[in-house]
Protein backbone atom coordinates (compact mmCIF):
# COMPACT_ATOMS: atom_id res chain seq x y z
CA UNK A 1 0.00 0.00 0.00
CA UNK A 2 1.56 3.32 -1.07
CA UNK A 3 1.66 6.44 1.13
CA UNK A 4 -1.38 8.00 -0.54
CA UNK A 5 -3.56 4.92 0.05
CA UNK A 6 -2.35 4.61 3.63
CA UNK A 7 -3.18 8.28 4.19
CA UNK A 8 -6.73 7.82 2.89
CA UNK A 9 -7.23 4.78 5.14
CA UNK A 10 -6.03 6.54 8.29
CA UNK A 11 -7.81 9.84 7.67
CA UNK A 12 -11.41 8.59 8.31
CA UNK A 13 -10.24 6.83 11.48
CA UNK A 14 -8.67 10.06 12.76
CA UNK A 15 -11.83 11.99 12.01
CA UNK A 16 -13.94 9.39 13.81
CA UNK A 17 -11.73 9.73 16.89
CA UNK A 18 -12.16 13.49 16.85
CA UNK A 19 -15.92 13.17 16.56
CA UNK A 20 -16.13 10.64 19.41
CA UNK A 21 -14.05 12.93 21.63
CA UNK A 22 -16.23 15.89 20.73
CA UNK A 23 -19.49 14.00 21.38
CA UNK A 24 -18.25 13.03 24.85
CA UNK A 25 -17.18 16.49 25.93
CA UNK A 26 -19.23 19.07 24.02
CA UNK A 27 -22.10 20.89 25.71
CA UNK A 28 -23.64 21.94 22.39
CA UNK A 29 -24.91 18.60 21.15
CA UNK A 30 -27.29 20.18 18.64
CA UNK A 31 -24.35 21.35 16.55
CA UNK A 32 -22.46 18.05 16.53
CA UNK A 33 -23.59 16.99 13.05
CA UNK A 34 -22.60 20.29 11.49
CA UNK A 35 -19.27 20.25 13.28
CA UNK A 36 -18.62 16.64 12.18
CA UNK A 37 -19.22 17.39 8.51
CA UNK A 38 -16.98 20.42 8.71
CA UNK A 39 -14.27 18.44 10.45
CA UNK A 40 -14.44 15.76 7.76
CA UNK A 41 -14.07 18.38 5.06
CA UNK A 42 -11.12 19.80 6.94
CA UNK A 43 -9.51 16.37 6.96
CA UNK A 44 -9.93 16.05 3.18
CA UNK A 45 -8.25 19.40 2.68
CA UNK A 46 -5.43 18.34 4.96
CA UNK A 47 -4.98 15.09 3.04
CA UNK A 48 -4.35 16.94 -0.21
CA UNK A 49 -1.40 18.85 1.17
CA UNK A 50 0.43 16.28 3.30
CA UNK A 51 2.45 13.23 2.42
CA UNK A 52 2.40 11.12 5.56
CA UNK A 53 -0.22 9.71 7.90
CA UNK A 54 1.10 11.58 10.95
CA UNK A 55 0.94 14.99 9.28
CA UNK A 56 -2.56 14.21 8.00
CA UNK A 57 -3.87 13.54 11.51
CA UNK A 58 -2.17 16.62 12.94
CA UNK A 59 -3.44 18.94 10.21
CA UNK A 60 -6.94 17.48 10.35
CA UNK A 61 -7.10 18.09 14.09
CA UNK A 62 -5.89 21.67 13.69
CA UNK A 63 -8.36 22.48 10.93
CA UNK A 64 -11.17 20.77 12.82
CA UNK A 65 -10.55 22.99 15.82
CA UNK A 66 -10.49 26.12 13.69
CA UNK A 67 -13.70 25.00 12.00
CA UNK A 68 -15.46 24.27 15.27
CA UNK A 69 -14.50 27.66 16.68
CA UNK A 70 -16.97 29.73 14.59
CA UNK A 71 -19.56 26.95 14.38
CA UNK A 72 -19.65 25.82 18.00
CA UNK A 73 -17.51 27.74 20.46
CA UNK A 74 -18.42 31.26 19.30
CA UNK A 75 -22.20 30.60 19.27
CA UNK A 76 -21.88 29.02 22.72
CA UNK A 77 -20.04 32.09 23.99
CA UNK A 78 -22.83 34.30 22.67
CA UNK A 79 -25.45 32.05 24.29
CA UNK A 80 -23.57 32.23 27.58
CA UNK A 81 -23.64 36.05 27.57
CA UNK A 82 -25.97 37.31 30.26
CA UNK A 83 -29.29 38.96 29.43
CA UNK A 84 -27.75 42.35 30.17
CA UNK A 85 -24.92 41.87 27.66
CA UNK A 86 -25.89 44.29 24.93
CA UNK A 87 -24.41 46.07 21.94
CA UNK A 88 -23.44 49.60 22.98
CA UNK A 89 -24.76 51.01 19.71
CA UNK A 90 -28.22 49.57 20.44
CA UNK A 91 -28.60 51.30 23.82
CA UNK A 92 -29.94 54.83 23.93
CA UNK A 93 -28.37 57.09 26.56
CA UNK A 94 -31.84 57.78 27.95
CA UNK A 95 -32.12 54.10 28.92
CA UNK A 96 -28.76 53.98 30.67
CA UNK A 97 -28.33 54.27 34.43
CA UNK A 98 -25.56 56.40 35.91
CA UNK A 99 -23.03 54.70 38.20
CA UNK A 100 -20.34 56.58 40.13
CA UNK A 101 -16.96 54.84 40.14
CA UNK A 102 -14.07 55.51 42.50
CA UNK A 103 -11.42 55.48 39.81
CA UNK A 104 -8.48 55.82 42.20
CA UNK A 105 -9.38 52.97 44.56
CA UNK A 106 -7.62 49.62 44.26
CA UNK A 107 -4.18 48.15 43.67
CA UNK A 108 -4.50 48.47 39.89
CA UNK A 109 -6.17 51.89 39.76
CA UNK A 110 -6.80 53.85 37.72
CA UNK A 111 -5.82 51.78 34.66
CA UNK A 112 -7.63 48.48 35.25
CA UNK A 113 -10.63 50.26 36.77
CA UNK A 114 -10.95 52.49 33.70
CA UNK A 115 -10.51 49.54 31.34
CA UNK A 116 -13.27 47.63 33.13
CA UNK A 117 -15.58 50.65 32.99
CA UNK A 118 -15.13 51.00 29.23
CA UNK A 119 -15.92 47.31 28.77
CA UNK A 120 -18.98 47.62 31.00
CA UNK A 121 -20.32 50.53 28.95
CA UNK A 122 -20.04 48.33 25.87
CA UNK A 123 -21.90 45.43 27.51
CA UNK A 124 -24.37 46.97 29.95
CA UNK A 125 -27.01 49.72 29.79
CA UNK A 126 -25.16 52.15 32.04
CA UNK A 127 -23.14 55.36 32.00
CA UNK A 128 -20.13 56.04 34.21
CA UNK A 129 -19.10 59.03 36.29
CA UNK A 130 -15.42 58.17 36.68
CA UNK A 131 -14.00 59.98 39.71
CA UNK A 132 -10.28 60.54 40.05
CA UNK A 133 -7.21 62.61 39.27
CA UNK A 134 -7.68 63.63 35.65
CA UNK A 135 -4.01 63.63 34.63
CA UNK A 136 -3.42 60.16 36.05
CA UNK A 137 -6.54 58.87 34.32
CA UNK A 138 -5.37 60.09 30.90
CA UNK A 139 -1.84 58.78 31.52
CA UNK A 140 -3.23 55.34 32.36
CA UNK A 141 -5.42 55.41 29.25
CA UNK A 142 -2.36 56.21 27.11
CA UNK A 143 -0.38 53.34 28.63
CA UNK A 144 -3.20 50.89 27.94
CA UNK A 145 -3.84 52.21 24.44
CA UNK A 146 -7.48 53.08 25.16
CA UNK A 147 -7.29 56.87 24.89
CA UNK A 148 -9.19 56.98 21.60
CA UNK A 149 -11.98 54.81 22.98
CA UNK A 150 -12.14 56.92 26.15
CA UNK A 151 -12.43 60.15 24.17
CA UNK A 152 -15.04 58.58 21.91
CA UNK A 153 -17.20 57.55 24.88
CA UNK A 154 -16.76 60.96 26.51
CA UNK A 155 -18.01 62.61 23.32
CA UNK A 156 -20.94 60.18 23.17
CA UNK A 157 -21.91 61.05 26.75
CA UNK A 158 -21.37 57.50 28.03
CA UNK A 159 -18.63 58.40 30.49
CA UNK A 160 -17.81 61.57 32.39
CA UNK A 161 -14.56 62.30 34.18
CA UNK A 162 -15.07 63.92 37.59
CA UNK A 163 -12.05 65.55 39.21
CA UNK A 164 -11.05 64.61 42.75
CA UNK A 165 -8.07 64.34 45.02
CA UNK A 166 -6.16 61.10 45.71
CA UNK A 167 -7.77 57.99 47.12
CA UNK A 168 -7.68 56.72 50.69
CA UNK A 169 -4.71 54.34 50.86
CA UNK A 170 -5.20 50.69 51.72
CA UNK A 171 -3.08 51.14 54.84
CA UNK A 172 -4.90 54.24 56.07
CA UNK A 173 -7.52 54.31 58.79
CA UNK A 174 -11.16 54.52 57.74
CA UNK A 175 -11.45 57.85 59.57
CA UNK A 176 -9.21 59.39 56.89
CA UNK A 177 -12.37 60.09 54.89
CA UNK A 178 -13.10 62.95 57.29
CA UNK A 179 -9.69 64.54 56.76
CA UNK A 180 -9.46 64.03 52.98
CA UNK A 181 -12.73 65.62 51.98
CA UNK A 182 -11.76 65.64 48.30
CA UNK A 183 -10.82 61.94 48.27
CA UNK A 184 -12.21 60.07 45.29
CA UNK A 185 -14.50 57.89 47.40
CA UNK A 186 -16.04 60.95 49.07
CA UNK A 187 -16.71 62.64 45.73
CA UNK A 188 -18.26 59.43 44.37
CA UNK A 189 -20.54 59.13 47.41
CA UNK A 190 -21.61 62.76 47.00
CA UNK A 191 -22.73 62.01 43.44
CA UNK A 192 -25.12 59.38 44.79
CA UNK A 193 -26.29 61.66 47.58
CA UNK A 194 -27.08 64.43 45.05
CA UNK A 195 -28.95 62.00 42.81
CA UNK A 196 -26.45 62.32 39.95
CA UNK A 197 -25.74 58.58 40.15
CA UNK A 198 -27.87 55.67 41.34
CA UNK A 199 -25.06 53.54 42.73
CA UNK A 200 -21.36 53.69 43.56
CA UNK A 201 -18.51 51.22 43.06
CA UNK A 202 -15.05 51.18 44.63
CA UNK A 203 -12.21 48.67 44.80
CA UNK A 204 -10.37 50.79 47.33
CA UNK A 205 -10.10 50.69 51.11
CA UNK A 206 -13.29 48.89 52.19
CA UNK A 207 -13.21 50.47 55.63
CA UNK A 208 -13.01 53.92 54.05
CA UNK A 209 -15.90 53.07 51.72
CA UNK A 210 -18.06 52.00 54.65
CA UNK A 211 -17.17 55.12 56.61
CA UNK A 212 -17.86 57.38 53.63
CA UNK A 213 -21.19 55.65 53.00
CA UNK A 214 -22.28 56.10 56.62
CA UNK A 215 -21.08 59.71 56.88
CA UNK A 216 -22.30 60.83 53.43
CA UNK A 217 -25.38 58.68 52.81
CA UNK A 218 -26.40 57.64 56.31
CA UNK A 219 -27.81 54.38 57.65
CA UNK A 220 -31.31 53.14 56.92
CA UNK A 221 -33.84 53.60 59.71
CA UNK A 222 -33.76 50.71 62.16
CA UNK A 223 -30.40 49.36 60.96
CA UNK A 224 -27.66 49.49 63.58
CA UNK A 225 -24.81 48.12 61.47
CA UNK A 226 -24.55 47.88 57.67
CA UNK A 227 -23.43 44.50 56.35
CA UNK A 228 -21.42 43.40 53.35
CA UNK A 229 -23.24 40.80 51.28
CA UNK A 230 -21.48 38.61 48.71
CA UNK A 231 -23.03 36.38 46.06
CA UNK A 232 -21.67 32.83 45.98
CA UNK A 233 -22.31 30.30 43.19
CA UNK A 234 -24.38 27.21 43.95
CA UNK A 235 -25.12 23.92 42.22
CA UNK A 236 -27.83 25.80 40.32
CA UNK A 237 -25.98 28.01 37.79
CA UNK A 238 -28.80 30.53 37.68
CA UNK A 239 -29.38 31.00 41.41
CA UNK A 240 -26.54 32.25 43.65
CA UNK A 241 -26.72 32.44 47.42
CA UNK A 242 -26.32 35.76 49.25
CA UNK A 243 -24.03 35.51 52.29
CA UNK A 244 -23.83 38.38 54.78
CA UNK A 245 -21.96 39.69 56.65
CA UNK A 246 -18.60 38.93 54.97
CA UNK A 247 -16.40 41.50 56.65
CA UNK A 248 -18.09 44.66 57.91
CA UNK A 249 -18.68 43.63 61.54
CA UNK A 250 -16.22 41.36 63.32
CA UNK A 251 -18.23 41.25 66.55
CA UNK A 252 -22.00 41.01 66.27
CA UNK A 253 -25.03 40.94 68.49
CA UNK A 254 -28.07 38.75 67.75
CA UNK A 255 -30.01 41.88 66.78
CA UNK A 256 -27.43 42.68 64.09
CA UNK A 257 -27.77 39.25 62.48
CA UNK A 258 -31.54 39.63 62.66
CA UNK A 259 -31.24 42.87 60.69
CA UNK A 260 -28.85 41.26 58.21
CA UNK A 261 -31.47 38.61 57.50
CA UNK A 262 -34.12 41.24 56.79
CA UNK A 263 -31.78 43.15 54.45
CA UNK A 264 -30.76 39.98 52.62
CA UNK A 265 -34.36 38.86 52.29
CA UNK A 266 -35.32 42.07 50.46
CA UNK A 267 -32.28 41.99 48.18
CA UNK A 268 -32.81 38.35 47.26
CA UNK A 269 -36.49 38.94 46.56
CA UNK A 270 -36.13 42.18 44.56
CA UNK A 271 -32.87 41.77 42.69
CA UNK A 272 -32.33 38.01 42.48
CA UNK A 273 -36.06 37.49 41.84
CA UNK A 274 -36.49 34.78 44.49
CA UNK A 275 -40.17 34.75 45.35
CA UNK A 276 -39.78 33.53 48.94
CA UNK A 277 -36.09 33.53 49.95
CA UNK A 278 -35.00 30.72 52.27
CA UNK A 279 -32.97 32.16 55.13
CA UNK A 280 -30.28 30.12 56.90
CA UNK A 281 -28.03 30.80 59.88
CA UNK A 282 -24.42 29.64 59.40
CA UNK A 283 -23.64 27.22 62.22
CA UNK A 284 -21.67 24.10 63.13
CA UNK A 285 -24.72 21.83 63.00
CA UNK A 286 -28.28 21.64 61.75
CA UNK A 287 -29.83 21.09 65.18
CA UNK A 288 -31.41 24.02 66.97
CA UNK A 289 -29.31 23.38 70.08
CA UNK A 290 -25.95 23.64 68.26
CA UNK A 291 -23.61 26.62 68.24
CA UNK A 292 -22.28 29.34 70.53
CA UNK A 293 -24.31 31.87 72.48
CA UNK A 294 -24.59 34.21 69.48
CA UNK A 295 -25.95 31.42 67.27
CA UNK A 296 -28.46 30.19 69.85
CA UNK A 297 -29.89 33.63 70.56
CA UNK A 298 -29.99 34.59 66.88
CA UNK A 299 -31.79 31.35 66.05
CA UNK A 300 -34.62 32.30 68.40
CA UNK A 301 -34.98 35.76 66.83
CA UNK A 302 -35.06 34.44 63.28
CA UNK A 303 -37.48 31.64 64.16
CA UNK A 304 -39.98 34.15 65.55
CA UNK A 305 -39.65 36.64 62.66
CA UNK A 306 -42.83 36.34 60.57
CA UNK A 307 -41.40 38.31 57.65
CA UNK A 308 -38.78 35.66 56.98
CA UNK A 309 -38.87 32.09 55.69
CA UNK A 310 -36.27 30.90 58.17
CA UNK A 311 -35.39 27.29 57.37
CA UNK A 312 -32.86 26.70 60.14
CA UNK A 313 -29.14 26.33 60.59
CA UNK A 314 -26.83 26.04 57.59
CA UNK A 315 -23.62 24.05 57.94
CA UNK A 316 -20.55 25.12 55.99
CA UNK A 317 -20.93 22.22 53.57
CA UNK A 318 -24.45 23.37 52.67
CA UNK A 319 -23.71 27.00 51.76
CA UNK A 320 -23.33 26.13 48.06
CA UNK A 321 -25.95 23.36 48.06
CA UNK A 322 -28.73 25.50 46.62
CA UNK A 323 -30.92 24.80 49.66
CA UNK A 324 -30.54 28.38 50.93
CA UNK A 325 -31.04 31.74 49.23
CA UNK A 326 -29.63 33.88 52.06
CA UNK A 327 -27.10 32.79 54.70
CA UNK A 328 -26.45 35.01 57.73
CA UNK A 329 -23.27 35.09 59.84
CA UNK A 330 -20.95 37.49 61.64
CA UNK A 331 -18.36 39.37 59.62
CA UNK A 332 -15.36 37.40 60.90
CA UNK A 333 -16.80 34.01 59.94
CA UNK A 334 -18.17 35.32 56.66
CA UNK A 335 -14.85 36.81 55.59
CA UNK A 336 -13.02 33.54 56.26
CA UNK A 337 -15.64 31.73 54.18
CA UNK A 338 -15.33 34.29 51.38
CA UNK A 339 -11.53 34.07 51.16
CA UNK A 340 -11.65 30.27 51.19
CA UNK A 341 -14.14 30.07 48.33
CA UNK A 342 -12.15 32.57 46.29
CA UNK A 343 -9.38 29.99 46.01
CA UNK A 344 -11.62 27.07 45.03
CA UNK A 345 -11.96 27.96 41.35
CA UNK A 346 -8.25 28.33 40.64
CA UNK A 347 -7.33 25.20 42.62
CA UNK A 348 -9.96 23.11 40.85
CA UNK A 349 -8.79 24.25 37.44
CA UNK A 350 -5.18 23.47 38.32
CA UNK A 351 -6.20 19.95 39.35
CA UNK A 352 -8.15 19.42 36.12
CA UNK A 353 -5.24 20.62 34.00
CA UNK A 354 -2.86 18.30 35.83
CA UNK A 355 -5.16 15.31 35.22
CA UNK A 356 -5.65 15.86 31.49
CA UNK A 357 -3.82 13.29 29.32
CA UNK A 358 -0.49 14.25 27.78
CA UNK A 359 0.73 13.96 24.21
CA UNK A 360 -1.05 14.48 20.91
CA UNK A 361 -4.32 12.95 22.06
CA UNK A 362 -4.26 15.05 25.21
CA UNK A 363 -3.80 18.23 23.19
CA UNK A 364 -6.70 17.37 20.90
CA UNK A 365 -8.91 16.46 23.85
CA UNK A 366 -7.96 19.62 25.72
CA UNK A 367 -9.03 21.68 22.74
CA UNK A 368 -12.53 20.23 22.94
CA UNK A 369 -12.62 20.52 26.73
CA UNK A 370 -11.60 24.16 26.70
CA UNK A 371 -15.15 25.48 26.80
CA UNK A 372 -16.13 23.08 29.58
CA UNK A 373 -13.20 24.29 31.67
CA UNK A 374 -14.08 27.90 30.95
CA UNK A 375 -17.64 27.34 32.13
CA UNK A 376 -16.37 25.76 35.35
CA UNK A 377 -14.05 28.70 35.90
CA UNK A 378 -16.85 31.16 35.13
CA UNK A 379 -19.00 29.65 37.87
CA UNK A 380 -16.27 29.44 40.52
CA UNK A 381 -13.89 32.31 39.74
CA UNK A 382 -14.38 35.19 42.19
CA UNK A 383 -13.59 37.61 39.35
CA UNK A 384 -16.89 36.58 37.77
CA UNK A 385 -18.66 37.67 40.97
CA UNK A 386 -16.46 40.71 41.38
CA UNK A 387 -18.43 42.79 43.83
CA UNK A 388 -19.98 42.67 47.28
CA UNK A 389 -22.90 44.83 48.38
CA UNK A 390 -22.93 47.16 51.35
CA UNK A 391 -26.49 46.77 52.62
CA UNK A 392 -28.01 48.97 55.29
CA UNK A 393 -26.98 52.43 54.04
CA UNK A 394 -29.15 54.89 52.16
CA UNK A 395 -27.70 54.12 48.75
CA UNK A 396 -26.43 51.27 46.58
CA UNK A 397 -22.75 50.64 47.26
CA UNK A 398 -20.69 47.87 45.65
CA UNK A 399 -17.30 46.95 47.08
CA UNK A 400 -14.68 45.41 44.81
CA UNK A 401 -11.62 43.36 45.72
CA UNK A 402 -8.48 45.47 46.11
CA UNK A 403 -6.76 43.48 43.35
CA UNK A 404 -9.67 43.87 40.93
CA UNK A 405 -8.87 43.94 37.23
CA UNK A 406 -11.08 44.68 34.25
CA UNK A 407 -13.19 41.50 34.45
CA UNK A 408 -13.90 41.99 38.14
CA UNK A 409 -14.88 45.60 37.51
CA UNK A 410 -17.37 44.57 34.82
CA UNK A 411 -18.89 41.96 37.12
CA UNK A 412 -19.20 44.46 39.98
CA UNK A 413 -20.80 47.07 37.74
CA UNK A 414 -23.29 44.45 36.59
CA UNK A 415 -24.30 44.00 40.24
CA UNK A 416 -24.53 47.78 40.72
CA UNK A 417 -26.72 48.14 37.66
CA UNK A 418 -28.94 45.21 38.63
CA UNK A 419 -29.57 46.59 42.12
CA UNK A 420 -30.34 50.08 40.80
CA UNK A 421 -32.62 48.92 38.00
CA UNK A 422 -34.77 46.77 40.32
CA UNK A 423 -35.54 49.63 42.71
CA UNK A 424 -34.27 47.74 45.73
CA UNK A 425 -33.66 50.94 47.70
CA UNK A 426 -37.38 51.70 47.83
CA UNK A 427 -38.12 48.45 49.66
CA UNK A 428 -35.05 48.72 51.88
CA UNK A 429 -36.04 52.24 52.91
CA UNK A 430 -39.55 51.02 53.73
CA UNK A 431 -38.20 48.25 55.96
CA UNK A 432 -39.66 48.51 59.44
CA UNK A 433 -37.12 47.98 62.23
CA UNK A 434 -37.35 44.65 64.05
CA UNK A 435 -39.32 44.70 67.27
CA UNK A 436 -37.05 44.60 70.36
Curated annotation (Swiss-Prot):
Keywords: Cytoplasm, Lipid biosynthesis, Lipid metabolism, Phospholipid biosynthesis, Phospholipid metabolism, Transferase
Catalytic activity: a fatty acyl-[ACP] + phosphate = an acyl phosphate + holo-[ACP]
Any GO molecular function: phosphate:acyl-[acyl carrier protein] acyltransferase activity
Pathway(s) this gene product operates in, as recorded in its UniProt entry: Lipid metabolism; phospholipid metabolism
BP GO annotations: fatty acid biosynthetic process; phospholipid biosynthetic process
InterPro entries assigned: FA_synthesis (IPR003664), Phospholipid_synth_PlsX-like (IPR012281)
Pfam family of the protein (one): FA_synthesis
Subcellular location: Cytoplasm
EC number: 2.3.1.274
Major place of residence: cytoplasm
GO cellular component, one term: cytoplasm
Similarity section: Belongs to the PlsX family.
Main function: Catalyzes the reversible formation of acyl-phosphate (acyl-PO(4)) from acyl-[acyl-carrier-protein] (acyl-ACP). This enzyme utilizes acyl-ACP as fatty acyl donor, but not acyl-CoA.
Subunit structure: Homodimer. Probably interacts with PlsY.
UniProt cross-references to NCBIfam families, sorted A to Z: plsX, PRK13845.1
Protein name: Phosphate acyltransferase
Source organism of the structure: Prochlorococcus marinus (strain SARG / CCMP1375 / SS120)
Gene: plsX
Amino acid sequence: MDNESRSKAIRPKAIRRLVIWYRRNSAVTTLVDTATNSASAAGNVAGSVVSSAGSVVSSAGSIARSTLQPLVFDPLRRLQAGPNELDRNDIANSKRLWVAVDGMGGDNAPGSILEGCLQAIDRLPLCIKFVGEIEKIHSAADELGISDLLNQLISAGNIELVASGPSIGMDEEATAVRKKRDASINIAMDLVKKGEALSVYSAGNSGALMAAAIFRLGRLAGIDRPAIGALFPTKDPGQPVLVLDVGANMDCKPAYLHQFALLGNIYSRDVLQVQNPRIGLLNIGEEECKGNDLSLRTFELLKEEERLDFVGNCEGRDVLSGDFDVVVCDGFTGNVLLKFLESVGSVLLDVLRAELPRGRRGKVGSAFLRNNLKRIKKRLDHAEHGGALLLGVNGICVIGHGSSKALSVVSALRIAHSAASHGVMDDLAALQPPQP
